[in-house]
Amino acid sequence: MGVLIAKKYSTKLFLNAADHTYVECGTGGKAWGCWGGKTGGTAFNSGTGSTKRADCIAKPDERAGITCYLINGVCHQAANRILLPAGILVSAARGYGVSSALFGTYGKTGFWPCSAPFDQCPGVSGDLPECIARSRSPKAAITRTQPATEAEVKYNRSVKQAYAKFDPLAASPLDTMQFHANLFDRQVKFRLGEDLGSVAVSLRLVKENFELDHRHIVVKFGQKKMSPAEFIKAFNELTLKFQDDTASSLNKTQYKKLLDMGHDERVVLADPAIILSLYGEATVKEVYGKL
């Protein structure tokens, strides 16, 4: 069985941006970019799994069905999909707590106007020729992260089951928003516990408001009533508002547990390098100015 490695590196924004993540097989002979670059990263998680299945999930564009950037998800969701055969996630990447709160573990699967089917390729097994180690080498020696706890395994299994049961083709926009709000509820309960009382109600409202606002800008963007730069800036504002509203609902310890960041720390998810590849330099400058 092959090895799948989660890798990450800091983006150009560095201090207030999430890490970019991608996936590489254990030999280093194949990598999947997950919307962005696929070299120069640091390994931070790994597991055994079929590299042929990972490649099937990734698809030729290496985006794993995360069809529209900032609509269905970001690199974290694409990487999680590709890592499915190994049963691991990119949860140790900076900003992952925010991206998973906004897009779920495996992305928004049915959010108009971009469908993002999660083809898990269950019938595919084996390994790519370039991912088969012919001898022991430094590339094959992977530093593994702390093994998942029983609670983490149970939580991840419940998330996979939720995605498997949800039919995006039969779902209305409201169904989709509720599905992702329910995924966030799972994340909250896993990170903070079951007995949250009014805190759980407050966080649910924060998430539902994000879902409504996100859908609003996605529809406007799809109808070409927003330019790419306007959409990205609006998405960044929603991302920051979500963090502000979440921080207002939680104490410092709770915020750290939920989003894996300090109470006053904020990140944005829109990677300038990916925006550059999608929309060009003028859009990057309009969104972020001179980097």
Q: At which residue positions do the language-model features occur?
A:
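Charge-rich (acidic/polar
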Residues: 143-291
